[in-house]
Design a protein with these regions (language model features):
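C-terminal "cap" of GNAT-fold acetyltransferases
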Residues: 9, 108-151
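Conserved glycine-rich acetyl-CoA-binding loop
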Residues: 57, 78-96, 103-105, 116-123, ...
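Short linear functional motifs in flexible/disordered or boundary regions
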Residues: 28, 50-51, 88, 107-110, ...
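Extreme N-terminal starter segment of soluble prokaryotic enzymes
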Residues: 2-4
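Acetyl-CoA-dependent GNAT
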Residues: 6-77, 82-83, 95-97, 101, ...
Length: 151
């Protein structure tokens, strides 16, 4: 099967929000954006949602938004691949597409946070060149904070 990864357009907000909502449930996310906040945060200049699709089915996502109060910084959010599609490199493709956009947009750094029980996510990001850093937000679920310098 071939995976198609692309940046969602405004017409695809509902599909993007649908897969992100699956992520909310799978990761037991406490702080969630409603559809209006989601569209304002992620369907804006310097932001986006990338979707992974197989045979017309959306199977994964990752989001990018500007990190408020920090020049040249973006924040990765909502990386998720449906369980039956994991292990195929889809998360790698999603993050690569997001990083290519971030570099083209002019971001110098990408930040992310994750929960203590998401050790596999932290290892994944470390393999992608992210390093642990100080807390940069007030997310009550996050205990791991990471940053990557973009080239």
């Amino acid at each position: 099967m071939s995976t198609k990864v692309y940046r969602a357009e405004n017409a695809e907000i509902a599909a993007a929000y649908g897969i992100v909502s699956e992520y909310y449930e799978a990761a037991a996310v406490v702080v969630r954006e409603d559809l209006d906040r989601f569209s304002k945060d992620y369907f804006a200049d310097g932001a986006g949602v990338w979707l992974a699709e197989e045979d017309g089915e959306v199977v994964g996502c990752v989001a990018l938004r500007k990190l408020s109060g920090s020049e040249g910084c973006g924040e990765i959010k909502r990386l998720y691949v449906r369980s039956k599609f994991r292990g195929r490199g889809i998360a790698d493709q999603l993050v690569l597409a997001l990083e290519e956009y971030a570099v083209a947009f002019g971001y110098k750094w990408l930040y992310l946070d994750t929960a203590a029980d998401m050790k596999a996510a932290a290892r994944f990001y470390e393999k992608k060149g992210f390093e642990r850093c100080e807390r940069y937000n007030e997310n009550p679920q996050a205990v791991i904070f990471m940053r990557k310098t973009l080239r």
